[in-house]
Amino acid sequence: MRWKRTIQLLDVHAEGEIGRVAIGGVPKIPGETIAAQLHWLNTDPKGDELRRFLCLEPRGAPIGSVNLLLPARHPDADAAFIILQPDQAHASSGSNSICVTTALLESGIVEMQEPETIVTLETAAGLVKATATCRDGRCEKVKLTMVPSFVHELDVEIDTPHWGKIKADLCYGGIFYALVDVGQINLTIEKANAAGLVQAGMILKELINRDIKVVHPEIPAISGVAYVMFRDTEADGTVRTCTTMWPGRADRSPCGTGNSANLATLHARGKAKVGDVFTSKSIIGSEFEVGLQAVTEVAGRPAVIPTITGRGFTFGLTQVALDPFDPHPGGFALTDVWGPSAGEI
């Protein structure tokens, strides 16, 4: 076979959300830090080419992410990674951290210790401590100690053409979120409403990023609202979530970074304290356990240290390749399955 590029992927999902892990063939990514490498992936044409190669058709699909395993730069880290999605490279993700931890341990890249293995992951947002419960050569569950999460602004009013004025909390949980109580758009979080939730999320994200600028005070490479997450609280205190992702799909997992951001809002409103633990449920009914481990500060702002616990499952091993005569090395996306914003890719 006349392939000019090959990348090996271990297929993993965390509570339903696919996070393929590139375990071989990853090209060298320029940059002295993981944040600098993230910036390169999002600004250099060669970085864009790599993302499109892996994430778009015919090699990719509108669901899931591809995680690039990279050499760690921090002396305390076991591995580093950056998340690639159809829109751009992202700094941090709870479900993808679970996928990466599961892949590292079950592939033997990091030696598994039973009954517990601690893996320190380096991301552009900082270090994530992953505590994996292991038995009989399998990673049964992963508890993540997430990066400090904080509120940018609560109850931001947004003028919308469909729902009038709605309020959103703009918060950081590893990336920036707009958190919206789902009742404001007259929907509930359930499978049958996935398309409507996604459409609303895409509209709101565009409106927010058009009018409001958010930048991490210590990591300028992380800026802009990445996702809109709809939320609701069930009678037993379970937080129901649906994170909407460009160009038009719903996160299948409860969303680790989104729940981290939401935990910051709960703490800011006096609804969560250190030691509290609650359940978050996704649109497909899968669950994360969310805890408030500690409080801290980020650039003088109150912040929380969340924990996210969930499960990862391997389901395949793939080798992605490029034939030198392939007319679509940069991939493509169509609105039939990629959503109404696919034409912007």
Swiss-Prot record:
Q: Where is the active site?
A: S93 (proton acceptor), C255 (proton donor)
Organism annotation = Rhizobium etli (strain ATCC 51251 / DSM 11541 / JCM 21823 / NBRC 15573 / CFN 42)
Annotated family: Belongs to the proline racemase family.
The UniProt GO MF terms for this protein read: 4-hydroxyproline epimerase activity; trans-L-3-hydroxyproline dehydratase activity
- Write down the top EC class of this protein: isomerase
What's the EC number here? Answer: 5.1.1.8
The protein here is known as 4-hydroxyproline 2-epimerase
**Keywords from the named record:** Isomerase
The UniProt entry, under Pfam families, shows:
Pro_racemase
Write the lineage as a comma-separated list: Bacteria, Pseudomonadati, Pseudomonadota, Alphaproteobacteria, Hyphomicrobiales
Listed PANTHER family? BIFUNCTIONAL TRANS-3-HYDROXY-L-PROLINE DEHYDRATASE_2-EPIMERASE (PTHR33442:SF5), TRANS-3-HYDROXY-L-PROLINE DEHYDRATASE (PTHR33442)
Give the residues the record marks as binding substrate: Q85, G94, S95, D251, G256, T257
Q: What does this protein do?
A: Catalyzes the epimerization of trans-4-hydroxy-L-proline (t4LHyp) to cis-4-hydroxy-D-proline (c4DHyp). May be involved in a degradation pathway of t4LHyp. Can also catalyze the epimerization of trans-3-hydroxy-L-proline (t3LHyp) to cis-3-hydroxy-D-proline (c3DHyp) in vitro, albeit with 2-fold lower efficiency. Displays no proline racemase activity.
Catalysed reactions, semicolon-separated: trans-4-hydroxy-L-proline = cis-4-hydroxy-D-proline
